[in-house]
Amino acid sequence: MGEIRYGPSGLPEAPTLEEAFAALAADGYRACEFGFVSGFWLDYEAAPQLAEAADAADVALSVHAPLAAFMGHADRGKKFKMALGMLDHTAGLAQACGARLIVFHPGFLLGREREQTIADVVDQLGDLRERLEAKGRLVPFGVEVMGRVRDFGTIEDVLVIAAQVDFVRPVLDFAHMHATSDGAFLDADTFAAALAATDAVLEPGAPFHIHFSDIQYANRNETKHLPYGEGTLRAEPLRDALARFERPATVISESPDAASTQAIGAVLGASSASRSS
């Protein structure tokens, strides 16, 4: 079984960054994903301080890009240029603070066939590559599996994109996948099948990147994240499935409350594993 790094989505509130990361470490967390979903709250001046605090606490960072920063636009107009700029800026900040992955959403069908949408995403990621390489900040990106059954961003879509773009990895959101499968993620075999498909496209040594929480859904579409135990998604089969792979994993809780994040971590054994490694 590969090492599991586990932690919350979002930094805890604290007077200083050092205290925030110390609080994460005290709870046994060794990963954290913070977001620019509603705006860029971090600047280049503060990013090195964040990197130092995370490193001192042995917390691996990932970043969630703004929601509007998706690829696969129907044309290269204003919205595409804005998204490209936001992903570029996110990459600069991620590099400055030592984040290991930037998570982004895959976009929308916008009336196109799925194959054409995938082709547009891959093509526009080529534009992003050129821009980031020119600035020396081509960091790993992760494209997230989405939570609405008829929309773009199924696990199949994500795997095809990641297989064609070498700096992009799949991000498995098991809450989303549980919703779109009408609650099928109940046993280790189902989790392991998704992990095996992802393992086949990840480069050697790269960890699985996973989002996890309990989930409410209707008509195979996500409606909201739930406190752990209120829905039907459980961490035990994820733990057992991960044990079948040598590849390490980063698991981020997107639970709406701290107690749920702690409960999921206890099942995964993330806290005890971190202290014995």
Predicted regions: what is each one?
Residues 72-172:
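Active-site acidic/histidine proton-transfer and metal-coordination neighborhood
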Residues 45-51, 80-87, 118-123, 155-159, ...:
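Charged helix-capping and loop-helix junction motifs
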Residues 9-13, 35-39, 66-70, 107-109, ...:
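Active-site beta-loop-alpha junctions enriched in small/polar residues
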Residues 4-10, 32-34, 61-65, 102-104, ...:
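Hydrophobic faces of well-ordered beta-strands that scaffold small-molecule active sites
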Residues 129-222:
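Acidic/histidine-rich catalytic cores of soluble enzymes
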Residues 258-274:
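C-terminal helical cap(s) of enzyme catalytic domains, especially alpha/beta-barrels
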Residues 21-28, 42-62, 88-98, 129-136, ...:
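Acidic (Asp/Glu)-rich catalytic clusters
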